[in-house]
Amino acid sequence: MVRFLRPSSTSRDVLGLVHGTAGQATLIQQYDNMLKNFLHMPMAHPVIIICDNDDGIVSLSKKVRSKFDKIVSKTTTDSFYHLCLNLYMVKVPEGDPPAATDIESLFDPELLTKVLDGKTFNPKKDHEDQTEYGKVVFAKAVIKANAETVDFSGFEDLLTRVEDVIRHYAKHSAVPSSSTVTP
């Protein structure tokens, strides 16, 4: 089962998850240090950061390279990037040939042209104005509101990458239980 973190004031304040890529970069930079404060960390599941493969990947790439010595860019095509502990990063698939892609590009292009109250969708907008709406409004008013009829088949490759992370974490985090340990 996959669960998504619901944005809240707690996730914003504690995890610093605001403003998309900037918040993701902060989480990547501070994740292992934040966990040092906890005595009990069962870490039964991986934590997966899904990021657009567009210009925003540059700031994430710098953090990943400086902290974990891993190379991530618009053109790298790894299924996922294991950063530390149970923290992973998955990019929106790059396409063939590799190119800048954001998660919205996985939807049917017709959905991206949906006009709401006379406003058009602009994936680069953080907020609404008189002529355009951004990703949050798109997610709520276009995708969530029409979830039963939206074609999600374009997400197949991304979901395969998430499955790859789950399999990798299950394989590499397994701790023998007392019933499987032999004396």
PLM regions with names:
Residues 1-65:
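Conserved helicase/translocase motor-coupling segment
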Residues 35-38, 64-76, 162-173:
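Hydrophobic, Leu/Ile/Phe/Ala-enriched alpha-helical segments that form helix-helix packing faces
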Residues 15, 19-22, 117, 133, ...:
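Feature targets compositionally biased, intrinsically disordered low-complexity regions
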Residues 9, 42, 111, 120, ...:
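Generic secondary-structure transition motif, activating predominantly at the C-termini of alpha-helices
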Residues 19, 31, 40, 45, ...:
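Histidine (H) residue identity feature
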Residues 44-150, 181-183:
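Activity-critical C-terminal alpha-helical subdomain
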Residues 2, 28, 32, 65, ...:
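Generic detector of well-ordered alpha-helical segments enriched in charged/polar residues
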Residues 137-183:
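Nucleic-acid enzyme cleavage-core boundary/entry regions
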